[in-house]
Amino acid sequence: MKFFIDTANVEEIKKVAKWGVLDGVTTNPTLIAREGRDLKEVIEEICSIVDGPISAEVISLESEKMVEEAKELIKIHKNIVIKVPMCEEGLKAVSELTKLGIKTNVTLIFSAQQALLAAKAGATYVSPFLGRIDDIGSFGIQLVEDIVTIFTNFGIESEIICASIRTPIHVLECARVGGDIATVPYKVFAQMLKHPLTDRGIEQFLEDYKSMNK
């Protein structure tokens, strides 16, 4: 499984990049707005930190304008992937961008049907949102499992980015059912590091070492 980090905070990206586990980054307009910085400036800095796919989202909701935005975004760096919302205009844009050889990530996927349409249109990645589905009393992981099964059945090459990750259990479940990628917030990465028995074991090692050197 590959790990992306879901943030536009460069300090968070730098921290996790040093662990040697990052394969890419996903951003969106909301995350970039929180940083209070110019979009291009933020994306350029992220690309200098992580050598992997960097998803940057278009703002327009008309396919022609999405394509125009995408052409500008890919000028920033060769690793840019164009993030497009799941909608009719989005699919039109994905189809056109695929013909131009531009990689795409279709976001806001909430059903396997949507994922199938996005893949058929040529999406490089599809992003089902686990946490938001859990929020309405359903099972986000079932969606990921359904998409994995369908893509496997038909040899579909679009990769599945498990998004809206809220807990380490979400990451574990995605890995269990075969999600290709988990895009994980910094907070959840930090939680994945921790286990009380690990902490206790380290404390015990230190106590034993000190007692040996008295």
UniProtKB/Swiss-Prot annotation:
It is found in: Cytoplasm. Its EC number is 2.2.1.2. One of its GO terms (biological process) is carbohydrate metabolic process. The active site is at K83 (schiff-base intermediate with substrate). The keyword Transferase applies. It catalyses: D-sedoheptulose 7-phosphate + D-glyceraldehyde 3-phosphate = D-erythrose 4-phosphate + beta-D-fructose 6-phosphate. Transaldolase is important for the balance of metabolites in the pentose-phosphate pathway. This is Probable transaldolase.
